[in-house]
Amino acid sequence: MKAYFIILTALFSSCVSNHYDRTESFTFSWKIGDFDQASQEIEKLAESGPKRDRMLYRMEEGAIKRLQNDFEGSIRAFSLAGDYYEKWFGVHLQSQTKISEELGSTIGSQEWKPYKSRVYERVMLRVYQALNYLQLGKEGQARAEIFKIRQAVSDAKDIWQKELDAARIMMREKSMDLDNGLENQMEGSLYEDLLQARSLVPSNLPDFVNPAAIYLEALFFLHGTNEKSDLEKARFSLRELYGIYPANPFIQEDYQQAIKNRSSKIPTTYIFFETGRAPVRREKRYDIPLVFFSATSRIPYAGIAFPHLVTNHNYLSSLEVFNGSEKSLTLPLADFDAIVANEFTKNFPIELTKAILGSVSKGALQYIATNAVRDESEEVRAVTGVGVGALAQGLTQSDWRSWTTLPKQIQFCKIPSPASRELTLRGVGTKLRESIILKPATINLIWIRSISAQTPLRVVNQFVLKP
């Protein structure tokens, strides 16, 4: 009995430290703009932190090194993150672990499982990696990363369908009806939080789509090469963007160029502006009502821990660009509140299945443990009851993990490049300013990062798309 209790205690103790605790120092350093300290913190986690989280740490590391203008270091970190993706999903989604097995592993906390990333994260990994290569003048490698953006979205649709099918099967095996629970009389705080997430998503945003990734792809094919097939790719991407932003004058102009099979010869600069911080996940406890269970189920309800999205509101609202004679204001392109919420609601049935199955499994564990000592003394039964209860509570945790250094929004504008080649950037409503000397070229691209309305503007990328 003593050994049994020690095992329970050890298991419970292992639940205490979570991802939020481990990354708190790193996140704080990044938020205040101390990128050197943040880089040291995340490198340490990437090398010696839990192996299950290494992919996430490498993505964070790659993002921080970009802010330090360490593009070679960023490439290495993102390449290692990409290796984890290949490990989890393999070529053409031939993963080593079946999705049904992954869903069926429900005893431990969701945070104990390897972090395999979310779709919007995999897309941004490829976007940042393409920008890294373009900064270093490696157009061939950048082209390969841009193709991987489309592949990530295509893979995501297949993965999502397989996971949803597996979730339905697993729930049926436990005498629970997933679709009935979601479609009929779902109510309470969990439903309210789901509706709140849905309210962040505009009706014209397609599933798993990041407009900033599409636009970078379009500009690369419109201005970066002279091949006819590339102009066709640019036209395809800009048509998709035009469907999302039909009133955006910059997209309209580029789309017309693609339709005419020629890019502008007027010296122009594109400015991309990352601002704020992406939504984070935080845990809430919910009771799941009877509606999720079939008439043959003997379980009246299940208590679960489930994530809800928390948006960040401290951000620079827009960037003004001045070329000496005219001004241009950045306009919305990719809203990560919407992108993250869209994927969150899309995956809601799958994540809910994991949470419910985990709760049921832990309930069974409690029953087995207490039943095993029913003939023992009252003291032993009490200690066992407390121990397994604490263990179940510790194991009932949602997955808080996500790529936290992503922005709240990516905005953009374009402006004629002046003869002086000097641009002045100003944070709207602030005293934040930055001056940039452009390279002599037909098409320049600038990538700016702002973490909050108080932190300085950071020039991350500056390169030539068309000489």
Predicted regions and their residues:
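Residue at a conserved register position within TPR or TPR-like alpha-solenoid repeats
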Residues: 29, 65, 133, 221-222
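C-terminal soluble interaction/assembly domains
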Residues: 367-467
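Glycine- and small hydrophobic-rich membrane-insertion segments that are intrinsically disordered
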Residues: 91-107, 171-197, 272, 279, ...
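Membrane-inserting hydrophobic helices used for pore formation or membrane fusion
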Residues: 213-324, 328, 332-335
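Bacterial Sec signal peptide processing site at the extreme N-terminus
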Residues: 15-34
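Structural motif corresponding to the intra-repeat A-B loop/turn of tetratricopeptide repeats
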Residues: 32, 68, 136, 224-228
